[in-house]
Amino acid sequence: MIGSLTVLPAVLSKLGDRVEKGRIPLLGRFRRPAGEGRIWGKVLNPVLRRPALSASLATALLVALAIPTLQIHTASSSLTTMPRSIPTVETLDRLQAAFPGKPGPAVIAVNTNTTSTAFRTAVAELQVAASATHRGYGAISVDSNQSHTVGRITIPLPGNGTDGTSTRALLTLRGQLLPATIGKLPGVTYGVTGATANSFDWNEMMKSSLPIVFAFVLTFGFLLLLASFRSLVIAAKAVILNLLSVAAAYGVVVAVFQFGWGQNVLNFTSNGAVAPWLPLFLFVILFGLSMDYHVFILSRVREAYDRGMSTEDAVAHGIRTTAGTVTSAALVMVGVFSIFATLPILDMKEMGIGLAAAVLIDATIVRAVLLPATMKLLGDWN
């Protein structure tokens, strides 16, 4: 923004008429004057003729895309999500098949005398209690430091390390098995780590941050729009439309990656979850992009309305005159974000598809249909 307001004007002023040099002659024939967007005009005319129907259909489509979000599950990805043709992944599959739980066991660090009879008894009780749960825990192994003051207990967990089976086994270990065995040792302190524990704890930390970030971003965006346009309706509607865009993008990501609908096309193995950091990342980035489009379009609509146009004419003028810019920017971003879907890393695929889908949805369904339809319906309330 600083560069656009300072460096860009200075450079353009310095260049003067020379900025026109280097134009490609043939491309000038395809340019159309502002306000003559025929494609968006064909879309916009029926929307403004039947705003209630258009708004209903657009909302229904966004809600349908967002429905998978209700089943969103987050977990860290691992080598198992990468293409099976990679030698490392093949080796990991063989290890997991031959030694279930060994590639990603739970590791318990225990601060106690590891040579004591009480400690050895507690470890034996832990093994018996783990076997009694019938959850598929593996055989326990124990080692300690040279001074025998800190022990390390390794116990293989069932599942692939990030699925529900592994998570439930981890919670049982932390909440029931360890307190009933190791936790009874006098003066003992212990903690559970390992790949599954790291993934679970990171996931829980991200979940706890979501409400705070959501509340701050929504409130901040609402207040900025309220200050800019002096309208509660415009500010509230912008927040709602942006939330619909984000929810629809979440739904696409969940369907493609968590449900595994895109496995064959994008060449990955679903772990039944999406990356823990992705919901927060997508929300912040997409809300900013959506708000940018929204303010850009509304500014043109307001300018037209202030010049004496009716609400319907101002909306049509604002959409048509900004459609080319919004569409071009959206296509560039969709193309750039889609590149991430070609990478072998699952998190990058999720980010690319999520961003590309959200920008495409926002620039078409939301800005070209839902926004003008709701503005026409609200009339002077805008």
Short names for language-model regions:
Residues Q71-Q263, V295, D347:
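Structured non-transmembrane domains adjacent to transmembrane bundles in polytopic membrane proteins
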Residues M1-T74, G187-V188, A195-N382:
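Membrane-embedded transmembrane helical bundles of large multi-pass transporters/channels
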